[in-house]
Amino acid sequence: ITNSITKRTKACFEPSIDYIVVKFPRWPFEKFTLADRSIGTQMKATGEVMALDRTLEGALLKALRSLEAGEGYLHLKKLDGQSLYDIRCLLSRIDNERLFVLAEALRRGIEPEEINRITKIDLFFIYKIQNIIRMERRLLKEGLTEETLKAAKRIQMPDPAIAHFAEISIKDVENFRKKFNLHPDYKMVDTCAAEFESYTPYYYSTYSSEDEVKPQGENAVIVF
């Protein structure tokens, strides 16, 4: 069986993946405010988004923006006023806000091991979210520099979040990106890490040092 993407490899060819995919459910609870928000075996999501990036942190933050709900970032404003005790209690609840509670717990200094004990979420994922929180703290401490901007964009932190933590305006962040010529590149989605040519390529944006998009001719069409 020939791989329909590369046209050169077979179905028995072991895939080599150089990107991460995050699928995130879309919950309808903002419309059904009285509905039970607990998550279990019953289907409650009304849709989902899928995001691709070179890092898990970046794919997660992309997915949150794609939901077009709330703040579009790993933060819930209503958690700001909760006490540390309340945050620990909320961690034990399995609902649509659990990921945001987890991030808030890390902001408050609760150790990943304690979060793992309460939630049973694998430490691998908790550490990845902790990387995002560490970037927030770095921006708060160091402000916006070429180095911190590149590090923040490497994990797909959006401009409004960077502006908030660096305590500057969104326009300043945009000017910094232009000053340092920092813009997203486009990588090809295939199953062979670009080892073979892909005959049905599609792309995702990421902040790296190499663009894999090739001119397709005068009559090329871009589909978003």
Regions inferred by a protein language model and the residue ranges of each:
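ATP-dependent carboxylate/acyl-activation modules
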Residues: 1-224
